[in-house]
């Protein structure tokens, strides 16, 4: 099953636990039936539910008050992380990386190794900037050796330049993705920046590739903070899922209410249209009980009424006030038909009705 759908389902179940009254809504009737068919018990509906049902008609007539959405909580509101030891990021220009496409000769490899040894000596003497410069010289001579970038990254960490260290580690991992030292120094650089989750990931991977006490000690420091951030994020993901479900249910409810309202309006229009035709059997004014010249047999029962009312020309004529007034006049006194012999609209309707019933006007 789709993991997103499972997440939404979990959020929906939590929502129902928090508010069991949701299970008594009309749109969740199918869920109640299923739970009960499986032997489950639905908590009783809140007392307000029956009251809501009895006052449903009145509520429908009143305009709905807009639902006030709760003020959004800040995602940082309840997240407190100890950021001791976190420093401002370094914004120096990117360091030299060497040409990775250069063809390295044996002589260049030897020279790079000499520069590396000089850099290590400078590092042991505490001359960090000299060590960086020498490692840079070695990298330019042999830009495809991952350990050189990792070594320079370690010096950048000591110089409190975590972004530079991360750039070196990224290049080293591109060359050799299985170097534990590279992940260790990148993890330490992320720790300096307060990137707790990234730091925990890199330090854990470093220990997995090649256990290191220094990396393990720092992992124990950063992991609780990384877990706290992850739990905080999951909490707000759950809130967002619950909010999405509530909004979806509200949209379904509004759509259903709108559909029902449209049906009621349509029914009211049909009833109003039928009422225009008075007491004539099936809807024509005045009853018109078989009194037209020629008899129009069967009018009292109007066996062909449905056919008549489905004729668009008849319906159009019925909407004409002049025609309906004449029709009412003739219905009350058939002798008055002579008054309308020269009115084509009236005579057209009478002719059509006579044809429907098999008689002549």
From Swiss-Prot:
Keywords: Chaperone, Cytoplasm, Repeat, TPR repeat. Residues 275-292 have a biased composition (Gly residues). Residues 311-350 form the STI1 domain. Residues 72-98 have a biased composition (Acidic residues). TPR repeats lie at residues 112-145, 147-179, 181-213. One HIP oligomer binds the ATPase domains of at least two HSC70 molecules dependent on activation of the HSC70 ATPase by HSP40. Stabilizes the ADP state of HSC70 that has a high affinity for substrate protein. Through its own chaperone activity, it may contribute to the interaction of HSC70 with various target proteins. This is Hsc70-interacting protein. The lineage of its organism: Eukaryota, Metazoa, Chordata, Craniata, Vertebrata.
